[in-house]
């Protein structure tokens, strides 16, 4: 019996194993890896205390970014993306402006999203094909940056102006129409003397991206994709709204009159507690905020590699 060539045995096993993953087993060689770079554009949106439906069309804002994909085999693709967009929510999309009990809160924020994820391809990739459709799902981890702002409207006749007194409220006269950053104002009493245990929320947070889409191979090098990805966050403060009201005087004494003015913008000031001593809620702390991104991707494949036999 002749001597067995280990090199060719290993090579044959590799080829047989790879061919079992290929829908067309009659083809011996195929490309098994690729690196792609491209653009992603679409719309970002927010869902939280200031929206009543998850897909609130008025919250959709343009989003743009870059994406890279690396496919080491056929069924899994690893991706990195960086995107910029905006999110927004407003009570006055839903509230009757004549309602004296309306909350009248609003916000908008720039949004930076950095995501690393794994795509699971439901069709096996074969880069020899000039065209084809590949459904996929993805999950990973995202780091996002946000900074909620709201527009201050100077109104000496407002309830908060009357409550604070004109000498104090008039300090804000030259800031009418200004878009004010809300996190530094601690609008829910964070780190005040009375609520020192409530810490300010961080403007950089982590989320879990979950989504899916379709990739359309246009030719050997270009791929068009359509997808939606939900970001499950661990914060309820994307909109600066989460828990309870705080007495405006307390806020004004600790952080200035702007904090009081932006914390309660209703037509009738809300007390810290109701008649039964229960907290007056400004938001719903039991549910975290969410955001999502609808995207269209266009990527260019730089290279693909064929499997090689090991060298001994």
PLM feature spans:
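Short loop/turn motifs that connect adjacent beta-strands in outer-membrane beta-barrel proteins
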Residues: 25-34, 75, 124-133, 150, ...
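Short glycine/proline- and aromatic-enriched beta-strand/turn motifs that initiate or cap beta-hairpins
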Residues: 26-69, 289-305
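Outer-envelope beta-barrel architecture signal
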Residues: 31-37, 74-76, 112, 129-135, ...
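Residues on the lipid-exposed face of transmembrane beta-strands in outer-membrane beta-barrel proteins
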Residues: 39-43, 66-70, 116-120, 139-143, ...
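Structural signature of outer-membrane beta-barrel domains
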Residues: 44-48, 81, 85-89, 142-148, ...
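Extracellular loop and loop/strand-boundary signature of outer-membrane beta-barrel proteins
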Residues: 49-55, 99-107, 195-200, 281-284
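Gram-negative (and chloroplast) outer-membrane scaffold detector with strong preference
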Residues: 76-180
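Predominantly the C-terminal beta-signal and adjacent terminal strand-loop region
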Residues: 219-312
């Amino acid at each position: 019996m002749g001597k067995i060539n280990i090199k060719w045995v290993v090579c044959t096993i590799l080829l047989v194993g790879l061919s079992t993953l290929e829908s067309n087993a009659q083809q011996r060689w195929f490309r098994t890896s690729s690196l792609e770079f491209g653009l992603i554009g679409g719309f970002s949106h927010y869902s939280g205390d200031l929206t009543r439906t998850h897909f609130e069309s008025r919250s959709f804002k343009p989003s743009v970014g870059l994406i890279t994909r690396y496919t080491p085999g056929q069924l899994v693709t690893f991706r990195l993306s960086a995107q910029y967009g905006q999110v927004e929510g407003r009570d006055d999309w839903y509230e009757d402006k004549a309602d004296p009990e309306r909350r009248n809160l609003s916000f908008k924020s720039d949004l930076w999203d950095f995501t690393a994820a794994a795509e699971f391809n439901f069709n096996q990739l074969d880069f020899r094909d000039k065209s084809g459709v590949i459904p996929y799902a993805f999950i990973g981890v995202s780091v996002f940056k946000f900074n909620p702002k709201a527009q201050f409207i100077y109104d000496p006749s407002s309830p908060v102006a009357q409550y604070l007194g004109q000498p104090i409220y008039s300090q804000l006269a030259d800031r009418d129409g200004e878009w004010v950053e809300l996190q530094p104002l601690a609008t829910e009493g964070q780190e005040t003397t009375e609520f020192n245990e409530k810490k300010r929320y961080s403007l950089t947070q982590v989320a879990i991206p979950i989504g899916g889409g379709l990739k359309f191979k246009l030719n050997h090098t270009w791929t068009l994709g359509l997808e939606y990805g939900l970001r499950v966050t661990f914060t309820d403060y994307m909109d600066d709204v989460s828990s309870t009201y705080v007495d405006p005087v307390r806020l004004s004494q600790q952080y200035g009159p702007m904090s009081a003015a932006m914390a309660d913008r209703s037509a009738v000031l809300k007390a810290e507690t109701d008649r039964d001593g229960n907290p007056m809620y400004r938001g719903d702390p039991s549910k975290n905020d969410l955001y999502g991104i609808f995207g269209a991707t266009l990527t260019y494949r730089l290279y693909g590699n064929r499997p090689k036999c090991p060298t001994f």
